[in-house]
């Protein structure tokens, strides 16, 4: 096959949720040339559950994905669904080829800062949140000057300071000010000052 094809699927759909159903599906698609499958370890209810409920209500069955990989060592099997930390990701990597982080990475994007060190052996320290924000400023400025809106970017970094002091103030400032017409990178600078300003001031005072 000249173009790589990947498939993302659930472990089952409605009443077609046996291991035999999953095996039949994967074997058929693999027979057509697909070598990579990203498998969400929940079944999907197409009738009766909303998309949001389908992400939370059906129980997770990681073991079924592990058994799929064991049955198909020649395929790349990537597991997805409810994985909330790098510790969990490492545990899954003992059984499958890859891990996909969805909501966890979106709600706490700085979670990814440790991936290279923890999972890929990179010895360099990760960029700080402050450095990430500073790098984002010129990018956001170009986006706005090209006709985009600040909120197109700001809404994706609400969780950057997840679990850190003053994270709520950071989120609130972006949520309130970034959607407004005419909002520019000053909103990002103000949000950054809310979380890092007090810390930087205390460091300067200690010198």
Roles of regions detected by a PLM:
Residues 2-4, 13-15, 19-36, 60-79, ...:
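Alpha/beta catalytic cores of nucleotide-metabolism and tRNA/nucleoside-modifying enzymes
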Residues 9, 45-49, 137, 154:
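General secondary-structure edge motif
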């Amino acid at each position: 096959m000249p173009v790589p094809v990947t498939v993302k699927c659930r472990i089952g759909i409605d009443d077609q949720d046996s291991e035999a159903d999953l095996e039949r599906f994967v074997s058929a698609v693999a027979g057509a040339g697909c070598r990579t499958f990203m498998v969400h370890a929940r079944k999907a209810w197409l009738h009766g559950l909303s998309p949001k409920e389908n992400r939370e209500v059906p129980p997770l069955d990681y073991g079924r994905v592990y058994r799929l990989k064991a049955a198909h060592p020649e395929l790349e099997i990537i597991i997805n669904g409810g994985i909330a930390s790098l510790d969990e990701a490492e545990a899954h990597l003992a059984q499958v080829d890859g891990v996909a982080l969805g909501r966890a990475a979106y709600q706490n994007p700085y979670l990814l800062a440790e991936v290279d060190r923890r999972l890929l052996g990179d010895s360099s320290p990760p960029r700080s949140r402050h450095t990430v924000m500073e790098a984002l400023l010129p990018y956001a400025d170009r986006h706005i000057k090209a006709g985009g809106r600040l909120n197109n970017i700001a809404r994706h970094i609400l969780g950057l300071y997840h679990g850190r002091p003053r994270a709520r103030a950071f989120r609130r400032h972006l949520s309130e000010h970034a959607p407004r017409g005419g909002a520019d990178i000053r909103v990002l600078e103000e949000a950054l000052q809310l979380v890092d300003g007090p810390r930087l001031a205390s460091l300067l005072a200690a010198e």
